[in-house]
Amino acid sequence: LPTDEFHFCGFLPVKSGQRAKRLAKLLDLPGTLALYESPYRITKLLGELAELARAREVVLARELTKKFEQIQRGTAAELLESYGEKKPKGEFVVLVGQALGSAGKQSADEMN
C-alpha cells in the first residue's frame, strides 16, 4: 500500500451510527488509512469495508511484534471470507488503501 500519504485513525467508535459516519468520512480521505480493531469487532469492520470500499486493498496485521504475528492482504470481502467460522484472536491493525483512481475528496485538516 502507498505510504506517501497515510492517516492514523485509531479505533472507530463502538456505536453503529457514529461508527458508520466516521468510517464514511475516513474513506473520503486521500492516502492509506491505518485503524486499530479488536477481535470482537474485526468481522464487523470487514463487512462494513466490503460494502463501502469494495475495490480497495486491505491489509490485516494481527499480533504485530508477537510470536503469532500474521499479515493478510486482499479485499475486505476476501479477508472476511477467510475467517468463516473461526473466531479472530488478537488485536488488529487494519490498513485500507485509497480508492483506485481517486485522490480523495477532502484533506485531514478539512475533516477536523
Residue ranges of predicted features:
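Class I SAM-dependent methyltransferase SAM-binding "motif I" and its flanking Rossmann-like core
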Residues: 1-29
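A contiguous loop/helix-start segment that scaffolds small-molecule binding in enzyme catalytic cores
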Residues: 32, 36-112
